[in-house]
Amino acid sequence: MATLISLNDANRMLIADSQEEFLQIACYDWISTANKAIHKRGAFYVALSGGKTPLQIFQEIVKKRAAISDCSKIVVFWGDERANEDVEAGSNYLKAMDILKGLRIPEDQIFRMDTADPKGDEAYEALIQKYVPDAIFDMVMLGVGEDGHTLSLFPETHALEEKERFVVFNEVPQLHTRRMTLTFPIVRQARHLVAYVQGENKQDLFHKLVHPLGRDTFPIERVGTPLNPVQWVLSSDSCRKTDLADIPADCKLEMF
């Protein structure tokens, strides 16, 4: 049985009861969002997330490919990408496309971030402006790190303060790396924002989300707004029962 939590006006959480339910919810949400966009606007413009959890979701989506109304109408961008000598080994693009090739999305509708180009961020922003109507994605997938980062928007990095650019290179000193990432201005205007969290290693993060006083705001908490909240999908193992108990009863609802 999933639990719906209204954490605040900008963040709504759905906690799955099992790993299977987590993947089902994430998969059906993705497919229904795609079908709605294709029906209404003729295409589904999505920014994908890197990380292990999205790869599991992609596998489920491919299994349920028949439920997608028209895979040829999917247009794929990325939310962030590594920019170092190990990019091929750790590339979000390569890992995702190894799975998503099963959807047979036209190659000219898949836009990879070119992190080898010193002006690749400007070029990627231009691609978004050219191909995504009004630069509004139908969906942006958001992973969440233990430190509360999302995409490559890490705590105490300069990209957090970007007000105009849609794509930037972001120096991440805590990881000794440089990443290309979408920024808040374009992410916040997406039609559907979804954050995915699973694993016991995220329990401390969930505790801090539930108890926000006395700490800095996490990057992921700066994404949603009351007019466009982030929908979180969490697995039960990412939340301690004691923290769930601390959430007021009128903010929780057992769904199904």
Swiss-Prot record:
Pathway: Carbohydrate degradation; pentose phosphate pathway; D-ribulose 5-phosphate from D-glucose 6-phosphate (oxidative stage): step 2/3. It comes from the Bacteria. Keywords: Hydrolase. One of its GO terms (biological process) is carbohydrate metabolic process. Gene3D superfamilies: 3.40.50.1360. Its EC number is 3.1.1.31. GO terms for molecular function: 6-phosphogluconolactonase activity. The keyword Hydrolase applies. It is an enzyme of class 3 (hydrolase). Pfam families: Glucosamine_iso. InterPro entries: 6-phosphogluconolactonase_DevB, Glc/Gal-6P_isomerase, NagB/RpiA_transferase-like, PGLS. It catalyses: 6-phospho-D-glucono-1,5-lactone + H2O = 6-phospho-D-gluconate + H(+). Hydrolysis of 6-phosphogluconolactone to 6-phosphogluconate. Belongs to the glucosamine/galactosamine-6-phosphate isomerase family. 6-phosphogluconolactonase subfamily. This is 6-phosphogluconolactonase. It comes from Chlamydia trachomatis serovar D (strain ATCC VR-885 / DSM 19411 / UW-3/Cx). The lineage of its organism: Bacteria, Pseudomonadati, Chlamydiota, Chlamydiia, Chlamydiales. The gene is pgl.
